[in-house]
Amino acid sequence: MDFIRLDTADNVVTAASRLPAGHIVETIKTLQPIPSGHKIATAAIPLGGEIRKYAQLIGYASTDIPAGAHVHDHNVSFRNTLSLIHI
């Protein structure tokens, strides 16, 4: 398997190896090359939408993320992360 889905509630999967643009993941095509260990949106995620992995909220879309897109720090916002550092 080229990707790992950790929970059915997730809207991202993790690439198990480097995937080229156009690679089929479930029912969608990757829009760009995806590095091993990075996330791929399995459905469109609107600006501000929740990103879920492990059935847990891991961040919010900082821009509209189309299905098949690479999901990483360039398009994910981690709200309240800074406040946790000071606890």
Q: Which residues does each PLM region occupy?
A:
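Conserved small/polar residues in nucleotide/adenosyl-binding loops
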Residues: 85-87
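Conserved SET/PR domain catalytic loop and adjacent active-site segment
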Residues: 3-81
